[in-house]
Amino acid sequence: MARLAAFDMDGTLLMPDHHLGEKTLSTLARLRERDITLTFATGRHALEMQHILGAISLDAYLITGNGTRVHSLEGELLHRDDLPADVAELVLYQQWDTRASMHIFNDDGWFTGKEIPALLQAFVYSGFRYQIIDVKKMPLGSVTKICFCGDHDDLTRLQIQLHEALGERAHLCFSATDCLEVLPVGCNKGAALTVLTQHLGLSLRDCMAFGDAMNDREMLGSVGSGFIMGNAMPQLRAELPHLPVIGHCRNQAVSHYLTHWLDYPHLPYSPE
């Protein structure tokens, strides 16, 4: 029996309308009743996730910013990882050949250089939103991550540019087909989950995890039981071909699987 369950949010727990379904909320509550530790492991900001936890009245650990922050049930900061100031400066000030918009994150929030209302659709559940700033005046000492949002082919070309400029000084990953992230070296959900399990006196073998994108790769590959969403990025399936694939987030597939796991643990599972 797993002792900790870790969940990605977008494309995993959240439905395509960016809400948590009632079946999902009910199943999460059942896990807590079984004394299974809940952990939300997401690229979203800690401020937003703390608001969501309050709204759904669930106790859960938080891995946010794709592993840049880990918080306890009480909101205590257990782990932090920031981009080196020189890396943040290079990414912010360089003229990249891209049409993608740039977004900067630190403990105070989400910052960008211009209004992009379409991006706020993903945050209707929480009301979290960006702050408009002059990117060139952004303090460099506390940047957790930098994201680029745009067309996937354009971002793929940008990834090559970033890698050539940064080398091994940053970790690049796609958190969605339309979002490329620049993270501290060694920073990912799997590394953050390792920190958390050590804090809790657990091993990664005691954990199950669910995800759909390349920012979930290390987490899914390191736990005792990793599950890939039916709507996952093809690259993730290719990287972890041995992991089982469950259903689509629109059908609350995590809830569907966990209900079977709780009620019929000895019977084979079918996502249909």
Curated annotation (Swiss-Prot):
Binding site for Mg(2+): D8, D10, D212
Recorded superkingdom: Bacteria
A Gene Ontology molecular function term of the record: magnesium ion binding
Cofactor: Mg(2+)
Enzyme class: hydrolase
Record has Magnesium as a keyword: yes
Entry EC no(s): 3.6.1.-
Entries under Gene3D superfamilies matching the protein: 3.30.1240.10, HAD superfamily/HAD-like (3.40.50.1000)
Keywords on record: Hydrolase, Magnesium, Metal-binding
Entry annotation: catalytic residues: D8
Catalytic reaction(s) noted: 4-amino-2-methyl-5-(diphosphooxymethyl)pyrimidine + H2O = 4-amino-2-methyl-5-(phosphooxymethyl)pyrimidine + phosphate + H(+)
Function: Catalyzes the hydrolysis of 4-amino-2-methyl-5-hydroxymethylpyrimidine pyrophosphate (HMP-PP) to 4-amino-2-methyl-5-hydroxymethylpyrimidine phosphate (HMP-P).
Family classification: Belongs to the HAD-like hydrolase superfamily. Cof family.
Protein name (record): HMP-PP phosphatase
